[in-house]
């Protein structure tokens, strides 16, 4: 653990979170920082409407950005509802076991590049096992009210920061919103003298 932390607010339903995750989790390899993963419910599950034109634009833009970054995109499974809830709760278990990088990358790739139904045991189980998690512990986490409260706290903290969309990065007193802000974050880390 280093003395500096970057909070990474993420939604499994956000394609931009999917695009940001590999680069976000790579930051500790290049900088003296830790990533604190903060999974949040999708906007649509928090009562915030997303216009249909924005959804269409987002899918085209994400495909273009994925191509630019050399990341696979599609087929897609929309995890809204149980898929998002299950992934968020398992991700909290993964945080406890320091396996959040493995789980988040595997689950988001399954959702955004492999079309895996993460709302089903058949879809989620292999992802959890591949990430190094015990499946029975994952099932317990999915129904654990304490885990649910942690996810709710992540949402509350995001809103208290005056943010709603993701991904959001918080470093010291700086907030950066969007997968295209990782380079700005790296400049802040360089200016802070944190490059390895």
What are these regions (language model features)?
Residues 12, 16-114, 188, 196:
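Structural alpha/beta surface segment adjacent to cysteine/selenocysteine redox centers
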């Amino acid at each position: 653990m280093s003395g500096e932390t970057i909070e990474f607010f993420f939604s499994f339903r956000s394609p931009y979170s999917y695009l940001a995750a590999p680069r976000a989790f790579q930051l500790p390899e290049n900088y003296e920082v830790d990533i604190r993963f903060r999974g949040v419910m999708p906007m649509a599950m928090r009562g915030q409407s997303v216009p249909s034109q924005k959804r269409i634009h987002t899918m085209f833009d994400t495909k273009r950005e994925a191509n630019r970054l050399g990341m696979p995109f599609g087929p897609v499974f929309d995890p809204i509802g149980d898929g998002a809830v299950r992934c968020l709760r398992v991700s909290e278990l993964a945080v406890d076991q320091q396996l959040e990088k493995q789980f988040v990358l595997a689950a988001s790739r399954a959702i955004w590049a492999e079309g895996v139904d993460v709302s089903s045991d058949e879809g989620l189980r292999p992802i959890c096992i591949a990430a190094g998690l015990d499946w029975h512990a994952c099932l317990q986490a999915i129904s654990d009210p304490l885990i649910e409260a942690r996810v709710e706290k992540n949402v509350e903290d995001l809103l208290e920061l005056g943010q709603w969309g993701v991904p959001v990065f918080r470093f010291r007193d700086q907030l950066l919103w969007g997968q295209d802000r990782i380079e700005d974050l790296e400049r802040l880390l360089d200016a802070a003298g944190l490059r390895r």
